Design a protein with these regions (language model features):
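Rieske [2Fe-2S] iron-sulfur-binding domain
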Residues: 2-18, 24, 29-156, 366
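C-terminal catalytic domain of Rieske-type non-heme iron oxygenases
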Residues: 61, 136-366
Length: 366
């Protein structure tokens, strides 16, 4: 891909036209759901433009199948689970967790073709990961990202979810570009020192960034959960990491220079941003704000949730406006994207994406 982050240079033609197409790798792990969403009652979810049904067996094992009965294509998610069997709501045809049909009420014989595809799942912390690509390629690919900290009692974790009417890449780039915080989030984050360019590096397909900040107040989104007032000056370091196109982390390392002897002075807030393509022009966005402080009160957690939601509502509104405009008028080369120095992390994302798609003999078009 021909892209540059130099000022005045175009960022390449993989987007915006590419954001209107099927531009996600299939041979990788994506997050299907939060673990607490998946229970004995079938859950319908579109993932990578496919209808999928998720549920749990009696022993707690999560299951994912194509959400379409092969008989008359009725959604299996509208059925029910009885004794670990998923029963189609239309004619009562039953399926096991491997997708094989186990019973057709009107006959004794079961054709081999009466089956649905099952998908490998891995549960890590608060999230369930799904593989929807070629199963034979699983051993050669990176495993799901470890999210075990989201279920660690030594952390207090706040989770949230959006369905956003945009291509998934827009969200992935947004959460790695923190230079927009001083502008788009001026009323919520209330920090104007984000406009400077972070230091970005790359190791294989992992994109990282780092930025140090002068002494100043912590954002009201997170200060209360850490026990600070909105005016309390602290020292903070920002470290971000994208180990997978599906997830990125944003670590806020906070130091209180005025902490009294014997009083804790260092804290960590870890943001996680998980994106999974849903349908064309729709994306599942799971977010998390985790503090390395056990047993933060429910009141403070809910206050954090409300504040973060208010800020992310601002992202959602702008990105959906952007995507709607590009969808109606995909200008392509007539209006190429013009890069700036703050785009480095986003450009690295596109480079990783291009390599993943090329490995599947696909590419982004412009």
């Amino acid at each position: 891909m021909n892209m540059s982050t130099n000022q005045g240079r175009t960022t390449g033609q993989s987007l915006p036209n590419g954001m209107l197409e099927d531009n996600y790798p299939r041979n990788m792990w994506w997050v299907a759901a939060r673990g607490d969403e998946v229970g004995e009652k079938p859950l319908a979810r579109w993932l990578l433009e496919k209808p999928v049904v998720l549920y749990r067996l009696k022993d707690g094992t999560p299951v994912a199948l194509d959400d379409r009965c092969p008989h008359r294509w009725a959604p299996l998610s509208a059925g029910r689970v009885v004794d670990d069997l998923l029963i189609c709501p239309y004619h009562g045809i039953e399926f096991g967790s491997d997708g094989r049909c186990t019973r057709i009420p009107t006959q004794d014989t079961i054709p081999d073709s009466m089956r649905v595809r099952s998908y490998p799942l891995v549960e890590s912390g608060a999230f369930v990961w799904i593989w929807m690509g070629d199963p034979e390629k699983i051993p050669a690919c990176d495993p799901p990202v470890d999210m075990s900290y989201t279920a660690d009692p030594n952390w207090s974790v706040v989770l949230g979810y959006y369905e956003v009417a945009v291509n998934w890449v827009l969200i992935r780039e947004n959460v790695l570009d923190l230079t927009h915080i001083a502008y788009l989030h001026s009323k919520t984050f209330k920090q104007d020192d984000w406009a400077s360019v972070p230091e970005v590096s790359m190791d294989g397909d992992t994109v990282t960034y780092r930025q140090d900040f002068d002494l100043g107040p912590l954002s009201p989104l997170f200060c209360h959960a850490m026990g600070f007032s909105e005016a309390k000056p602290v020292k903070r370091e920002q470290e971000g990491r994208m180990p997978s196109l599906a997830v990125s982390f944003s670590d806020w390392n906070v130091h209180d220079p005025e902490a009294q002897p014997g009083v804790r002075a260092d804290f960590l807030m870890r943001g996680c941003h998980i994106v999974t393509p849903s349908q064309r022009g729709k994306t599942h966005y799971f977010w998390g704000a985790a503090f390395d402080i056990p047993n933060i009160s429910t009141e403070l957690c809910e206050r954090t949730r409300a504040s973060v939601t208010e800020a992310f509502d601002e992202d959602k509104a702008l990105l959906e406006q952007l995507y709607a405009q590009v969808s109606m008028d995909p200008c392509g080369v007539d209006y190429p994207e013009i890069g700036r120095l703050g785009d480095t992390a986003g450009v690295r994302v596109r480079q990783v994406l291009q390599r993943k798609l090329a490995a599947e003999d696909r590419s982004l078009s412009g």
